[in-house]
Amino acid sequence: MARKRNENSLAENRKARHDYFVEEAMEAGLVLVGTEVKSIRNGRVNLKDCYADIYNGEIFVKNMHISPYEQGNIFNVDPLRERKLLLHRDEIRRLDGLVSRDGYTLIPLSLYLKDGKVKVALGVCKGKKNYDKRDSMLEKAHKRDMDRAIKEKNKY
């Protein structure tokens, strides 16, 4: 059975939890221009290969693809442009300290609406090795089999 999608969830980076260990997640605002919000509300956003970097005390998301809005004409911007994240200075410093450790990076996990504003769930992640991915897939399969067996047993 497919997972129910949250009503105010706009996009989700499903590969992030497969490719990375998510150590910590936090909410950040996103600076958008013009018709990007309309395009995001239509679900025309891709988080698959995006990541965040810290420059001069500011965090920017790279490779987040927001398709141009069809009725946007001259107000459309570059779909892959860098977008600034809105966080407090002390939060940025703390994230900078976490990411400076070897192997850690900032990955956007999902986009959602909160009080009419687009927010990003930003995760501090460490990359998985291939054997970690296989182990997590096996754990998922075992859990699914156990749930199926319990459901069958409780059926009668």
From Swiss-Prot:
<comment type="similarity">
    <text>Belongs to the SmpB family.</text>
</comment>
<dbReference type="InterPro" id="IPR020081">
    <property type="entry name" value="SsrA-bd_prot_CS"/>
</dbReference>
<keyword id="KW-0694">RNA-binding</keyword>
<dbReference type="InterPro" id="IPR000037">
    <property type="entry name" value="SsrA-bd_prot"/>
</dbReference>
<protein>
    <recommendedName>
        <fullName>SsrA-binding protein</fullName>
    </recommendedName>
</protein>
<dbReference type="InterPro" id="IPR023620">
    <property type="entry name" value="SmpB"/>
</dbReference>
<comment type="function">
    <text>Required for rescue of stalled ribosomes mediated by trans-translation. Binds to transfer-messenger RNA (tmRNA), required for stable association of tmRNA with ribosomes. tmRNA and SmpB together mimic tRNA shape, replacing the anticodon stem-loop with SmpB. tmRNA is encoded by the ssrA gene; the 2 termini fold to resemble tRNA(Ala) and it encodes a 'tag peptide', a short internal open reading frame. During trans-translation Ala-aminoacylated tmRNA acts like a tRNA, entering the A-site of stalled ribosomes, displacing the stalled mRNA.</text>
</comment>
<dbReference type="Pfam" id="PF01668">
    <property type="entry name" value="SmpB"/>
</dbReference>
<dbReference type="GO" id="GO:0005829">
    <property type="term" value="C:cytosol"/>
</dbReference>
<keyword id="KW-0963">Cytoplasm</keyword>
<dbReference type="GO" id="GO:0003723">
    <property type="term" value="F:RNA binding"/>
</dbReference>
<dbReference type="GO" id="GO:0070929">
    <property type="term" value="P:trans-translation"/>
</dbReference>
